[in-house]
């Protein structure tokens, strides 16, 4: 996680309730993918070495001395050139040495192609985005529907509180206690249609007008604090990997720092079901010292208000 961007979102509509107009604090951590110096280095070295193995194997098949024997073109002195020409280089037999070298050369070319293809697509790149809402939030649609008061309901020549009570009777007939978000649009269309049975039931009689179009407003999405993890993958259904977890699902931030031949420097997101989601770009990490890794993990745990675990 190389960079951190703090963004405040202030795009709210006029219909957004006041308790939802809290600007969330958003942090974005940019993740470096396959386009790093080490991948460029190994892709070049593997490609160069595999070409050398393949040319040596081909030269043994055609009984050439060596396709990479270039002293005739890069000699800097005639005396050195004449002395080198007197040396007879051994001819490599095609079976089994040349055949094995051709195999390793082709295998190396496939590996280098995989590395260059990963670099081109920037596999593993993405970001970790954290949304923290500090204001009052509602976790269910029923809580939102219960919070609607009579001032939000409008009617033509009718008491809005009576419409609300009649509507509750209607919803109880449908085995629901409050306005259901999934059927709100359908219910809104029925209430604005004077000839519908729902409208006649809600108004309580023919002398009462139906609800206006603004009586029911679409239910806004519930803003819950969450973390979004986005990564670029290989072409196919997993080209875009987009994971989202609620802050309530996060139990801790796990820090792993292992030294040695197979070093490991990672920051993981530990969920309540004991799953661990990698937050860094690679198992080797982007930090040189343990202090840098610890500082990044502690800031993240403090921002999420969760525990910090160590593993070494």
Swiss-Prot record:
It holds the Pfam family Ycf4. It is found in: Plastid, Chloroplast thylakoid membrane. It is a multi-pass membrane protein. The keyword Thylakoid applies. GO terms for biological process: photosynthesis. Keywords: Chloroplast, Membrane, Photosynthesis, Plastid, Thylakoid, Transmembrane, Transmembrane helix. GO terms for cellular component: chloroplast thylakoid membrane; photosystem I. The chain crosses the membrane at residues 42-62, 91-111, 113-133. Seems to be required for the assembly of the photosystem I complex. Belongs to the Ycf4 family. This is Photosystem I assembly protein Ycf4. It comes from Pleurastrum terricola (Filamentous green alga). The lineage of its organism: Eukaryota, Viridiplantae, Chlorophyta, core chlorophytes, Chlorophyceae.
């Amino acid at each position: 996680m190389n960079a951190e961007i703090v963004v405040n979102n202030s795009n709210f509509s006029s219909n957004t309730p006041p308790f939802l107009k809290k600007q969330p604090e958003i942090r974005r951590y940019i993740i470096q993918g396959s386009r790093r110096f080490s991948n460029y280095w190994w892709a070049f070295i593997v490609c160069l070495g595999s070409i050398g193995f393949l040319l040596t194997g081909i030269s043994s098949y055609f009984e050439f001395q060596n396709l990479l024997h270039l002293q005739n073109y890069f000699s800097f002195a005639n005396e050195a050139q004449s002395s080198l020409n007197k040396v007879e280089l051994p001819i490599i037999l095609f079976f089994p040495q040349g055949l094995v070298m051709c195999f390793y050369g082709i295998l190396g070319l496939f590996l280098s192609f995989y590395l260059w293809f990963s670099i081109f697509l920037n596999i593993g790149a993405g970001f970790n985005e954290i949304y923290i809402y500090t204001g009052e939030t509602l976790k269910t649609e029923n809580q939102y529907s219960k919070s609607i008061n009579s001032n939000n309901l409008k009617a033509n020549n009718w008491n809005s509180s009576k419409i609300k009570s009649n509507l509750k009777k209607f919803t109880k007939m449908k085995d629901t206690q409050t306005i259901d978000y999934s059927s709100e649009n359908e219910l809104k269309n029925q209430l604005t249609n004077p000839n519908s049975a729902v409208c006649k039931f809600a108004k309580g009689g023919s002398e009462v007008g139906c609800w206006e179009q603004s009586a029911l407003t679409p239910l806004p999405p519930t803003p819950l604090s969450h973390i979004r993890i986005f990564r670029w993958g290989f072409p196919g259904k997993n080209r875009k990997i987009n994971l989202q977890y609620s802050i309530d699902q996060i139990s801790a931030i796990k820090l792993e720092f292992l030294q040695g031949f197979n070093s490991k420097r990672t920051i993981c997101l530990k969920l309540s079901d004991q799953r661990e989601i990698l937050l860094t770009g690679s198992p080797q990490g982007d930090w040189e010292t343990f202090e840098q890794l610890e500082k990044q993990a502690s800031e993240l745990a403090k921002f999420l208000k969760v525990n910090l675990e160590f593993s070494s």
